[in-house]
């Protein structure tokens, strides 16, 4: 996600992304990521997938945005909000 976000900003070539439907470019980027992981699955199918698939279920993959500082800035996420993760707890790989 971090690499995709950096690539997105490189594609803007230093220009600001236009606001569309009152959403900034960064907000649209993160919303698109979340929508990509939307899913609806029955409990039995989820249990079977957890037992056989090496990948985490979609609801856990979508929450990786909590580790990206830009997500907090894009949505003005505050410390008292449910998805807030303190900066010293955010995972940084690159």
Q: Where are the language model's segments positioned?
A:
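Zinc-dependent metallohydrolase catalytic domains
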Residues: 1-94
């Amino acid at each position: 996600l971090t690499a995709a976000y950096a690539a997105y900003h490189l594609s803007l070539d230093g220009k600001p992304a236009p606001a569309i439907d009152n959403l900034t470019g960064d907000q649209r980027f993160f919303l698109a990521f979340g929508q990509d992981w939307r899913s609806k699955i029955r409990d039995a199918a989820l249990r079977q997938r957890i037992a056989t698939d090496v990948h985490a279920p979609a609801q856990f993959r979508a929450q990786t945005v909590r580790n990206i500082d830009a997500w907090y800035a894009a949505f003005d996420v505050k410390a008292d909000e449910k998805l807030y993760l303190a900066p010293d707890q955010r995972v940084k790989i690159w």
